[in-house]
């Protein structure tokens, strides 16, 4: 299992705007570049379709992470909160092909016992997955966003994913799974807490 440090700028975000016309023009040029005719039947609408798909696939670029973790509850809970097997679909920034898998996200609330809704954790995973990504950074961004908003005593994030850039090109090893982890706070400093969380995550 690979551990990760904080990626640069993971706790800040500049909201961007999607340029539909520019994306369509770029896809049209790409079709020319591979020797296709973008005006032929079957491809005439492809630039617009791909642009719309990219807008959806990269929607995380256009959403402020702070808007996702905007609901807190004072539950005075001081034990582990763990959400397992959160499906994720992301796009490798090196080849712009998909990687997909699951995320396991856990945290121990801070001294104030503040927690967020379980659906908010899933939305946070989705937000960071919907960007051009590398798995290591994705894992750290999820962890750092929870640290920033919840001020918890500890955070652990484990992501398991298959990368199509390894399955359909290059070494062509379908089924290979990459596992990354990010630990913060108590899970980084206390081996027993980390082992307990990992046991719960890996238990089927």
From Swiss-Prot:
Q: Which reaction does it catalyse?
A: GTP + H2O = 7,8-dihydroneopterin 3'-triphosphate + formate + H(+)
Biological process terms from the Gene Ontology for this record are: one-carbon metabolic process; tetrahydrobiopterin biosynthetic process; tetrahydrofolate biosynthetic process
Transmembrane annotation, as ranges: none
**Matching PROSITE patterns, A to Z?**
GTP_CYCLOHYDROL_1_1 (PS00859), GTP_CYCLOHYDROL_1_2 (PS00860)
Keywords from the named record: Hydrolase, Metal-binding, One-carbon metabolism, Zinc
Biological pathway: Cofactor biosynthesis; 7,8-dihydroneopterin triphosphate biosynthesis; 7,8-dihydroneopterin triphosphate from GTP: step 1/1
Q: Tell me the enzyme class.
A: hydrolase
Identify the InterPro entries for this entry: GTP-CH-I_C/QueF, GTP-CH-I_N, GTP_CycHdrlase_I, GTP_CycHdrlase_I_CS, GTP_CycHdrlase_I_dom
Q: What is this protein called?
A: GTP cyclohydrolase 1
């Amino acid at each position: 299992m690979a551990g990760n440090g904080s990626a640069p700028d993971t706790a800040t975000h500049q909201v961007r705007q999607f340029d539909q016309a520019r994306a369509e023009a770029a896809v049209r040029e790409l079709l020319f570049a591979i020797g296709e005719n973008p005006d032929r039947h079957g491809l005439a609408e492809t630039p617009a379709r791909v642009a719309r798909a990219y807008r959806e696939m990269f929607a995380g670029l256009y959403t402020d992470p702070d808007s996702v973790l905007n609901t807190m509850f004072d539950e005075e809970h001081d034990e582990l909160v763990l959400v397992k097997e959160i499906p994720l679909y992301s796009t490798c920034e090196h080849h712009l092909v998909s990687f997909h898998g699951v995320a396991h996200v856990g945290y121990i609330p801070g001294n104030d016992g503040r927690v967020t809704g379980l659906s908010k954790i899933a939305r946070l995973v989705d937000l960071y997955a919907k960007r051009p990504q590398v798995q290591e950074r994705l894992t750290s961004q999820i962890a750092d966003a929870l640290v920033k908003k919840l001020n918890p005593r500890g955070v652990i994030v484990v992501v398991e994913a298959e990368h199509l850039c390894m399955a359909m090109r290059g070494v062509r090893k379908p089924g290979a799974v990459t596992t990354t982890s990010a630990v913060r706070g108590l899970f980084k400093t206390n081996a027993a807490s980390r082992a307990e969380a990992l046991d719960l995550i890996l238990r089927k």
